[in-house]
A protein has these predicted regions:
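Active-site lid/adjacent beta-loop-alpha segment flanking the redox-cofactor pocket in flavoenzymes
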Residues: 7-26
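Conserved Rossmann-fold dehydrogenase catalytic segment
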Residues: 1-2
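NAD(P)-dependent Rossmann-like dehydrogenase/reductase catalytic/cofactor-binding core
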Residues: 24-130
Length: 130
């Protein structure tokens, strides 16, 4: 989840986490929120083993499931990922700003894929930035 979602927003292969301190910072923010919620629920993430901490060896160009869904113009599993963590955070009074931003960005990308922001036929339409 912590690498799947930011990669989908950026639209880049997973190598972005080795090549960008910014992508690493976003991933770490998501992971910290996940770990805080898990700890509050009595779940010991450290029991998941070393593999989950370092991940699997994959080509830098690999695209995880959420990005594959967006590429194919399908709706994603964001409600099961960030959506669930946001709900749990509210129940536990834990702030989840990284997950909230990620949730809304991916939902907006889904809307874009659905054609919501296609203004090609609206050349004369005016809007105001608020």
């Amino acid at each position: 989840m912590c690498n799947n979602l930011p990669q989908a927003i950026l639209g880049a292969g997973v190598g972005c986490y080795d090549d960008s301190i910014h992508m690493k910072a976003i991933s770490d923010g998501l992971r910290n929120e996940l770990e805080t919620i898990a700890t509050s629920k009595g779940i010991d993430i450290n029991k998941s083993g070393e593999l989950s901490k370092r991940g699997s060896a994959v080509p830098a160009s690999s695209r995880y499931s959420t990005l594959q869904d967006l590429d194919a113009k399908r709706h994603t599993e964001i409600d099961m990922f960030s959506g669930a963590l946001i709900r749990m955070g509210k129940e536990l009074n834990i702030k989840t700003p990284y997950n909230e931003f990620t949730y809304h960005m991916i939902k907006a990308l889904e809307e874009k894929n659905d054609g919501k922001f296609d203004y090609t036929g609206d050349k004369d339409k005016v809007t105001w930035a608020k």
